[in-house]
């Protein structure tokens, strides 16, 4: 994907959850809100913060102001969607491709987007980036002027005019000579996937939006996912509220996969079980075959979407099922979020492009961003006085994805060896860890919530932002009772988690001054702050982890992101935009049984 306009189009407008609960299950909405968002919790955790602020003014496309420390970040300009995570058998590494623009202060300017490429063997260390597909195609009647999202796969011998074993990229883009219509092109590589300079089909599209069997709305024709299936190639293409499905025997000439039907996967199929009102557009589809522990194999359809009337902003979803006789996806489950956070989008996946080959585990990474604020101008200071940054674009840590026998996916983060490891064991309300260098154990409280007083457990300021936290919460008497609160502050910006282990529900709230006075005024800043609950309340999600004697949470922080991982493999990713290299990390809890404790392990992470 991406939008050629300076702001997301009108059909990406989100409706505030708080104003639309009457259109949802009212009982469920009220239960969620009343359970997690008591007045005490919303007020208490904003008190007693030790804040550090740094003003940074950076205006270079290679500025380090918004550069992550251990997450993959574009070397310059702007980046968003991942294209493919493909194993390179010749080089013994993974090829990664992602969308790139010249500058992040206006990343959606038509004609600016190209592909960047890097490689990795361990998803911790990445090689220097290079341009893989140029923003402008070769001069031809129907060439492209901006390269958007697509797929890379190895030619198995059936793609016409391409050497067997060569990598081939299928990608969407904007047509150069007709004002920017969306179509699909192809190109192949003669340097083992580093660049794609040999264009297929005379630089004419292999899928054209204007054909009578392609996009019904004659606008959206992007993000092709190409796989091998039963001796032919299938292409899944994002087409507004549908996914078009096409077949080809030579990789150039395409037709409907279902010759007697519309050959579309509709919203009621790929978002089965979720309220689909205001959920267009679908983007970035990807098909993989995965094997469950019981030996059975299933096709998994991943895609980007949103479900505002289910309380979900844009994110990455998956649904499990199989392909029918024509290659159209048939669901066997309801759709689920792969990551429950607001900023895991434009994701892609390893695994075989041959659907006959099943993977027990695949790897995934997502763009840390949200089109409702990330592309609308980010300042380099909390007071939002600087010019918009010209360098922005980071990705989540890679995750191992495994499909369980219940047809749910478990996500496990891949991180490097931590350094400067510190352990704090048996931390309790009576023996907390506080102060600079963890030098104090003076207890204090921080207001009240549903289950009583909120107690401090850990409050250590001015730590480096590149941290791994392993948090083992437990109760010495029974199941863990009482809320768990994690507050992470960069200057005056924050990410705050409020988790209830008794029912598994949690709330995440955020604030970033760098989003103020954006290209669309305060709209982007307000969306980041309000979420879909409104009034600064962010989002509510269900972790599925409840009534446990102990709970293990993993928290990964870097300059541009925070990632929470629950023990059942559920995750929540959120972007942040402060340029400060330091953060304050705080843990609070209720303790109605007088038995709650936490063991804390923290370490620094880097790409070195």
Region spans (language model):
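Bacterial N-terminal signal peptides
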Residues: 38-50
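Carbohydrate-active catalytic/glycan-binding domains of CAZyme proteins
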Residues: 59-595, 602-607
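Eukaryotic endomembrane contact-site and trafficking scaffolds
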Residues: 1-15, 19-20
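Low-complexity intrinsically disordered segments
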Residues: 6-9, 30, 50
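Sec-dependent signal peptide cleavage junction
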Residues: 47-64
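Short, Lys/Arg-enriched N-terminal segments with co-localized hydrophobic residues
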Residues: 18-29
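Bacterial N-terminal signal peptides that target proteins for export
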Residues: 27-40
């Amino acid at each position: 994907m991406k939008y050629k306009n300076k702001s997301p189009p009108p059909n990406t407008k989100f409706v505030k959850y708080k104003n639309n609960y009457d259109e949802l299950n009212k009982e469920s909405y009220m239960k969620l809100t009343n359970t997690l968002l008591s007045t005490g919790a919303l007020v208490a955790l904003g008190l007693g913060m030790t804040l550090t602020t740094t003003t940074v003014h950076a205006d270079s496309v290679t500025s380090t102001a918004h550069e992550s420390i251990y997450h993959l970040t574009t070397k310059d300009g702007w980046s968003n969607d991942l294209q493919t995570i493909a194993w390179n058998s010749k080089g013994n590494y993974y090829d990664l491709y992602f969308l790139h623009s010249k500058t992040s202060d206006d990343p959606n300017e038509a004609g600016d987007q190209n592909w960047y490429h890097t490689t990795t063997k361990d998803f911790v260390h990445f090689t220097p980036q290079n341009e893989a597909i140029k923003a402008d195609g070769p001069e031809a009647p129907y060439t492209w002027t901006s390269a958007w999202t697509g797929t890379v796969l190895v030619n198995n011998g059936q793609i016409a005019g391409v050497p067997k074993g060569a990598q081939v990229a299928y990608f969407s883009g904007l047509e150069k000579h007709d004002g920017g219509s969306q179509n699909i092109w192809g190109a192949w590589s003669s340097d083992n996937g580093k660049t794609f300079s040999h264009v297929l089909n005379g630089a004419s599209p292999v899928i054209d939006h204007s054909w009578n069997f392609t996009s019904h709305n004659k606008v959206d024709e992007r993000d092709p996912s190409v796989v091998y299936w039963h001796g032919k190639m299938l292409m899944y293409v994002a087409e507004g509220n549908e996914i078009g499905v096409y077949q080809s025997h030579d990789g150039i000439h395409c037709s409907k996969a279902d010759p007697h039907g519309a050959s579309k996967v509709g919203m009621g199929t790929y978002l089965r079980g979720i309220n689909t009102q205001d959920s267009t557009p679908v983007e970035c589809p990807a098909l993989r075959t995965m094997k469950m522990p019981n030996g059975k194999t299933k096709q998994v359809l991943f895609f980007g979407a949103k479900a505002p009337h289910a309380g979900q902003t844009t994110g990455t979803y998956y649904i499990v099922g199989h392909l029918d006789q024509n290659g159209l996806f048939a669901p066997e489950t309801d759709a689920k979020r792969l990551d429950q956070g607001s900023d895991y989008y434009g994701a892609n996946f390893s695994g075989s492009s041959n659907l006959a080959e099943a993977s027990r585990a695949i790897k995934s990474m997502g763009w840390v961003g949200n089109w409702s604020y990330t592309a609308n101008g980010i300042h380099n200071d909390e007071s939002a006085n600087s010019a918009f940054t010209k360098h922005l674009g980071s990705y989540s840590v890679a995750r191992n994805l495994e499909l369980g026998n219940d047809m749910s996916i478990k996500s496990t983060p891949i991180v490097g060896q931590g350094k400067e490891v510190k352990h704090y064991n048996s931390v309790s309300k009576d023996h907390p860890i506080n102060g600079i260098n963890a030098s104090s154990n003076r207890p204090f409280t921080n207001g009240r919530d549903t289950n009583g007083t909120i107690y401090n457990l850990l409050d250590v300021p001015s730590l480096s932002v590149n941290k791994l936290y392993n948090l083992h919460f437990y109760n010495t008497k029974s199941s863990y009772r009482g809320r768990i609160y994690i507050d992470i502050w960069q200057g005056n910006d924050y990410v705050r988690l409020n988790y209830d282990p008794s029912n598994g529900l949690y709330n995440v709230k955020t604030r970033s001054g760098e989003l103020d006075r954006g290209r669309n005024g305060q709209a982007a800043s307000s969306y980041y702050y309000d979420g879909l609950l409104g009034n600064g309340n962010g989002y509510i999600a269900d972790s599925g982890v409840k009534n446990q004697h102990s709970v293990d949470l993993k928290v990964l922080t870097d300059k541009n992101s925070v990632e929470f991982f629950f023990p059942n493999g559920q995750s929540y990713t959120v972007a942040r935009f402060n340029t400060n290299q330091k953060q304050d990390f705080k843990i609070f809890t209720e303790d109605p049984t007088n038995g709650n404790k936490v063991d804390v392990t923290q370490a620094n992470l880097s790409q070195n």
